[in-house]
Amino acid sequence: MLKKIGKFLLVLVVLGISMGLILYPFVSNYLFENRADGIIDTVEKTADDADEEKYKEEIEAAQKYNAELATGHVVLKDPFVEEKLDEDAKEYNSLLNMADGGVMGFIKIPCIDVSLPIYHGTSAEILELGAGHLQGTSLPIGGESTHSVITGHTGLSSAKLFTDLTELEEGDMFFLHVMGEKLAYKVDQISVILPEEMDKLTIENGKDYCTLVTCTPYGVNTHRLLVRGERTEYTEDKEEEAGKIGRVSCRERV
């Protein structure tokens, strides 16, 4: 009798562990998304409550930073390789940081149900929390001769992040919300490169680009997937319609 009870308890333990392993990614991602939503709410409230003069100063400082990048020559490095922060990091981290905590704003990719805060930098710690803006690229406020780069991990067991970026197609839409401004980008180019081939992320004169970057292939991570969007007119209808479509391609309705 005791042996039967022991075997039964062992089966229950094994089943419990198995169920835990199966459910962990779903539960973990649910908790991650709740936390991300809370941060996004804080960012939106901060932008809504911002003093007009302070807001103007922040935007002008970001525009100045972007103008200097457009006229200079920056050598971009793989965002998924840890680099020692340079002397400009302090100034960079102070820009678009009204909500504190290093959050610039947030990105929405309705086609793949992604909504993530955008942090300054691409350190390992940052990319565990959400999307990271690649230092050395234009700040995500748009404008002529700008090219922002937003990075995110693929394949984390604790959160989805940019795992489904491979599902995007040319013509799909994504949206940036920064300092109360809303920017829309339509995917116009998708490419796969080696980590050292960062020249595709450079600024093009007169263009307003934002590129999303993640590792690929899934679980191997030897290459980088680049999903570039070109700025297009933002309307509330575009974002709302894209949100209704969910995982179906945004192209047919937006």
Question: What would you call each of these model-derived segments?
Answer:
Residues 4-247:
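Solvent-exposed, non-transmembrane regions of membrane-associated and secreted proteins
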